[in-house]
């Protein structure tokens, strides 16, 4: 789209300076006019829009699957029942600190007031998400060195859980924005 816009712009500028085009014949100028009009006609449907127009037309709104939010009490219970080995993991602290906001988790995400609290929640969720993505990457590297089928099944299962949790966190972040 951008290259076509650029070509149409250049052709239009050339037509505006028709007196400078000594080598063009009448026929070439007419051809250029016709092709420029055709390009501009096709480009009009791709005209750039402002953010305000896009928001007004609800193009930027995405439907978010909030069914994952119903699992929050179960997830919180799992977090409280983890072993000491997991508590030493780098993921544990931000997830535990997120439980401070459990009183907000019963609300619709978009109804959380804008401000410092929402910013803190988003920051913690993004931190958790980045650490989960790093964990998923490490698990994918670990798969290559596994020779035991039970360990392989366990790693694949944990990668699926990581990916599902990452998707849940990303959808929650999108609904908070």
Swiss-Prot record:
Oligomer and partners: Binds M1 protein. May interact with human nucleoporins and exportin XPO1/CRM1.
Keyword Transport listed: yes
Cysteine pairs bridged by disulfides in the record: none
Taxonomic placement: Viruses, Riboviria, Orthornavirae, Negarnaviricota, Polyploviricotina
UniProt protein name: Nuclear export protein
Motif (Nuclear export signal): 91-100, 117-127
Organism per entry: Influenza C virus (strain C/Mississippi/1980)
Superkingdom of this protein's organism: Viruses
Gene from which the chain derives: NS
Functional summary from the UniProt entry: Mediates the nuclear export of encapsidated genomic RNAs (ribonucleoproteins, RNPs). Acts as an adapter between viral RNPs complexes and the nuclear export machinery of the cell. Possesses no intrinsic RNA-binding activity, but includes a C-terminal M1-binding domain. This domain is believed to allow recognition of RNPs to which the M1 protein is bound.
Annotated compartments: Virion; Host nucleus
UniProt keyword terms in alphabetical order: Host nucleus, Host-virus interaction, Transport, Virion
One of the record's GO cellular component terms: host cell nucleus
